[in-house]
């Protein structure tokens, strides 16, 4: 029951969202809202773990700012405004025209958004791959979950800019199999921008006087750099959910409500992990989340060439985090037996 207090707002928002879905389209719409909420939560649970790794180093003021402003940006910015902006750029349309298209011609809106999938995947995949590699390619990292893999990766930390090199190679390798020179160039440019944005976000922590922790993560003392890093991370995680939602419905209000409910639950999980000290108690949970991020980055790149069901994407993340949790429990039992 103690954990339930972290989900009070999420449960309340869920009730409001289901009622809103029912008013918009009856029971079928309410059901789609529920399915989208589950989809978003499953796709972004690893995001909650990574959020917690940053938030636990931030002061209370910036934690509250992230949880308040961050949820507004996550729901209205990433799940509503961002897709509209993408369609506006793709179709060279103004804001009013795009909103009109989304509300009154949702099929065309969905088609235009989906047409930019390769660029969205390149940007998000590159950003998430850098997050994944920065954690594991660190010669100072001494805690390993999958030691046969993670231990050799730490040695790559001696190679200057190894993360950037591997990410660029992944972008180029993925683009080599794409049809059409224009599409390949769009993918490469978007991927490079994902790389640039990550470097800027990570570098902001150093500029503002951050302290480097295990896994190479910069933790800004002021909290602002951490706030921006988390928002960019949330944006990268939201891409798959926004695109995948159109497989269920083309109604923008229904999509926004469903994904918004999911985003609220992700924030609630984040709160619980931070204030219950879960990451400290389960030493491999963080590793599982970063492996899930690496898997999501790979799926985004592979998804350019073939359709990968969103259920599989969410399932693989849940399996990795679940396995890391089980390994943590096993480690705790062994450690307590030795003490």
What are the residue ranges of the model-derived segments?
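Multi-pass alpha-helical transmembrane bundle typical of ion/small-solute transporters
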Residues: 1-339
């Amino acid at each position: 029951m103690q954990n339930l207090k972290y989900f009070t707002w999420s449960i309340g928002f869920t009730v409001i969202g289901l009622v809103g879905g029912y008013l918009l389209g009856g029971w079928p719409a309410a059901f789609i809202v529920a399915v989208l909420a589950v989809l978003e939560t499953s796709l972004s649970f690893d995001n909650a773990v990574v959020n917690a790794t940053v938030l636990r180093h931030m002061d209370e003021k910036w934690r509250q700012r992230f949880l308040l402003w961050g949820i507004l940006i996550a729901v209205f910015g990433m799940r509503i405004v961002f897709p509209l902006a993408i369609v506006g750029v793709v179709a060279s349309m103004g804001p009013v025209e795009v909103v009109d298209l989304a509300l009154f011609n949702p099929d065309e809106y969905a088609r235009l958004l989906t047409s930019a999938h390769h660029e969205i995947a390149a940007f998000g995949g590159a950003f998430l791959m850098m997050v994944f590699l920065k954690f594991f390619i660190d010669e100072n990292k001494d805690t390993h979950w999958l030691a046969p893999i993670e231990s050799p990766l730490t040695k790559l930390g001696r190679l200057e800019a190894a993360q950037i090199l591997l990410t660029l190679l992944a972008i180029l390798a993925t683009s080599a199999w794409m049809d059409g020179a224009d599409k390949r160039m769009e993918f490469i440019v978007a991927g490079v921008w994902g790389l640039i944005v990550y470097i800027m976000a990570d570098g902001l922590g150093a500029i503002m006087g951050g302290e480097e922790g295990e896994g190479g993560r910069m933790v800004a003392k002021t909290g602002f750099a951490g706030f921006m890093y988390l928002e960019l991370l949330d944006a990268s995680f939201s891409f798959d959910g926004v695109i995948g939602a159109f497989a269920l419905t083309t109604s923008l209000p229904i999509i926004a409500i469903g994904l918004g409910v999911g985003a609220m639950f992700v924030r609630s999980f984040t709160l619980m992990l931070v204030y219950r000290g879960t990451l400290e108690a389960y030493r491999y949970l963080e590793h599982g989340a970063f492996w899930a991020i690496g898997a999501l980055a790979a799926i985004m790149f592979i998804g350019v060439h073939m359709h990968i069901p969103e259920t599989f994407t969410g399932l693989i993340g849940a399996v990795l985090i679940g396995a890391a949790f089980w390994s943590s429990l096993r480690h705790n039992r062994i450690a307590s037996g030795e003490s």
